[in-house]
């Protein structure tokens, strides 16, 4: 068990059950925009316990707020987290949290900037092949 306060942002069908099991954890429900950013920026580590997410954009949102990530070494976190720079991937999330505390928050912010919506859109467009309209020989 880790010391410190634990906050869960988000919601789901198990919230009532989990609230009863973890009385030392605050369950805040969904947060958006500036309010979400404020909560993330005020934290020490973002714990991403999922074993099944395919990408995990919430990890990039946390990094954009300067928050290092502690996650399992599975698809999603493996694709997003730079091990030892923006987060720690470990089967033991407690150990991952402890190690993530030592990471430089500015590295997290800088890395997240590489994956902003604008840069992602530019990358997507750069992979599109030009199409030739019917009846024309050259792409437009």
Per-region residue spans from a language model:
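Nucleotide-activated donor-binding/catalytic signature segment of Leloir-type glycosyltransferases, i.e.
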Residues: 5, 15-34
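Short alpha-helical donor nucleotide-sugar binding micro-motif in glycosyltransferases
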Residues: 31, 38-43, 124
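Aromatic "clamp/platform" in nucleotide-sugar-dependent glycosyltransferases that forms part
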Residues: 51
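Short glycine/serine-rich donor-binding loops of glycosyltransferases
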Residues: 56-59, 77
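Short hydrophobic beta-strand element within catalytic cores of glycosyltransferases
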Residues: 64, 68-71
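A charged, aromatic-enriched C-terminal amphipathic alpha-helix characteristic of glycosyltransferases
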Residues: 101-139
């Amino acid at each position: 068990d880790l010391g410190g306060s634990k906050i869960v942002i988000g919601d789901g069908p198990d919230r009532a059950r989990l609230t009863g099991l973890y009385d030392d954890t605050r369950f805040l429900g969904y947060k958006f925009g500036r309010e979400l950013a404020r909560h993330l920026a005020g934290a020490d580590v973002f714990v991403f316990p999922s074993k099944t997410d395919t990408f995990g954009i919430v990890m990039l949102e946390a990094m954009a707020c300067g928050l290092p990530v502690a996650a399992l070494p599975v698809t999603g976190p493996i694709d997003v987290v730079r091990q030892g720079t923006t987060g720690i991937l470990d089967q033991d999330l407690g150990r991952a949290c402890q190690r993530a505390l030592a990471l430089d928050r500015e590295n997290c912010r800088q890395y997240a900037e590489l994956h902003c919506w604008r840069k992602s859109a530019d990358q997507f467009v750069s992979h599109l092949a030009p199409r030739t309209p019917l009846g024309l020989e050259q792409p437009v």
